[in-house]
Design a protein with these regions (language model features):
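Conserved N-terminal beta1-alpha1 strand-loop-helix module at the mouth
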Residues: 1-80
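Well-formed, non-transmembrane alpha-helical positions, independent of function
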Residues: 83-84
Length: 85
């Protein structure tokens, strides 16, 4: 079985919308050089929608870097339920 390469990265608590746009433009350009590599990014939750929109049509996948361990909604201040994403 052939092994494949996957590269993933997250922002931690860095960046702005402008920073993201610039970073993603460069990433989309560079990823084209490596078509056999799967790439995924995990921005902070507040940027997921904008990042996903900018990456429409590219092979780069988008995910969340933090998800609450709770399975049901509730009063968990600062947490993000997986279903909310």
């Amino acid at each position: 079985m052939k092994r494949s390469l996957t590269v993933m990265g997250n922002w931690k608590m860095n960046g702005t919308r402008g920073d993201n746009e610039s970073l993603l433009r460069e990433l989309v350009f560079e990823v084209k050089k490596f078509p056999s590599v799967e790439v995924a990014v995990f921005p902070p939750a507040v940027f997921i929608d904008a990042v996903a929109q900018q990456l429409v049509g590219s092979p780069i996948r988008v995910g969340a870097q933090d998800v609450c361990e709770q399975l049901k909604p509730g009063a968990f201040t600062g947490e993000i339920l997986g279903a909310m994403l």
